A protein has these predicted regions:
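N-terminal small/polar loop signature for handling phosphorylated ligands or for N-terminal nucleophile
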Residues: 1-39, 139-153
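Active-site segments that bind and position negatively charged phosphate/pyrophosphate groups
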Residues: 116-230
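Short glycine/serine/threonine-rich phosphate/pyrophosphate-binding segments
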Residues: 22-28, 48-51, 180
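A short secondary-structure junction motif
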Residues: 103, 107-111, 140, 163, ...
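C-terminal charged capping/lid subdomain of soluble metabolic enzymes
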Residues: 112, 220-293
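A glycine/threonine-rich phosphate-anchoring loop and its flanking beta-alpha core
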Residues: 32-126
Length: 293
């Protein structure tokens, strides 16, 4: 509201959103409120905000507040991979962790549903989101570390920003359905209630452990172990300790998780008890993997 009240913004012909996810989502609100066209210029590849018709807003303590649904997505997204390559590597790293959630979360949310055209397209496209991250992720991080806008970095940036963003647009509406996110993000939404975790670790970093939790809950152990090995290879978390959560924190995370929209998006009924156990079991699998390396 403060930005939208500025005279230079009111008098502008269009809104340019330059920066990361929170800057972009702020501009979505401004563009919607002032009925101005929005163009996005992501300076990092840490999420799909530059492409989506959804905004995520947070409280001052970094805990999740609510979603905002503009009437349309940004008109165009401009990606300069050299800018991405010169951004902090840890943001690309966290972006990989966040994007790893798209395929498994959409699949879980849409399983058993008779989907109409648009969300069916989203589910089909979600299947394209994981493999590029696993195939190119490690090399992309190396290129980012060297500030090189190579092909691997481009493939990963496009996956994080564009592929997952298009899936989000196809699987999310303000009122009809929300198949965009599930248990992996439930771990993230609970983590800020544990200051050591929520304040010290990036969104995608925590979500990447949430992916292992979701796949454990879903008993998809083969896929979990594949992504666990990938996480370990690039330094993404595979244990609770790596995101500063302890056994005593799990119920707090689960209690918060059960209150968010993502908990209710699947035809499957989730329980807090099983969710806590899935976090424990994912942690045990991660510890075992690391011990054997």
């Amino acid at each position: 509201d403060m930005v939208a009240a500025l005279e230079e913004v009111k008098n502008a012909d269009m809104v340019f959103a330059v920066g990361g996810g929170r800057a972009v989502d702020t501009c979505k609100y401004v563009a919607e409120k002032l009925d101005k066209p929005l163009f996005t210029f992501p300076t990092i590849a840490s999420n799909c905000a530059p492409v989506t018709a959804i905004g995520v807003f947070y409280n001052p303590d970094d805990s999740f507040k609510d979603y905002f649904y503009p009437t349309r997505c940004p008109l165009h997204t401009f990606i300069d991979t050299q800018v991405i390559a010169e951004a902090p590597e840890k943001l690309l790293w966290a972006g990989i962790g966040d994007a790893l959630s798209k395929e498994c979360e959409v699949e879980l949310c849409t399983r058993g549903r008779d989907l109409p055209h648009t969300p069916l397209m989203g589910r089909t496209m979600a299947a394209c989101c994981t493999d590029p991250l696993v195939s190119y992720g490690k090399q992309a991080l190396e290129q980012c570390r060297a500030n090189v806008a190579g092909d691997a970095l481009a493939q990963v940036a496009l996956c994080i920003i564009v592929s997952t963003g298009i899936v989000s647009n196809f699987t999310t509406t303000a009122n009809d359905y929300y198949y965009n996110s599930s248990l992996a993000h439930c771990v993230y939404y609970g983590a800020p209630l544990v200051p050591a975790s929520g304040h010290n670790h990036l969104h995608g970093e925590i979500v990447s452990f949430g992916v292992l939790t979701l796949l454990t809950y879903d008993k998809n152990f083969a896929r979990r172990d594949e992504l666990l090995a990938f996480n370990a290879s690039v330094g993404l978390p595979v244990t609770l300790a790596q995101i500063e959560l302890t056994e005593n924190d799990l119920q707090t995370v689960a209690d918060k998780a059960a209150t968010v929209l993502e908990w209710r998006c699947s035809l499957q009924t989730f329980t807090k008890e099983a969710f806590v156990q899935a976090m424990r079991d994912a942690d045990a699998a991660g510890k075992k993997y690391l011990a054997n390396q």
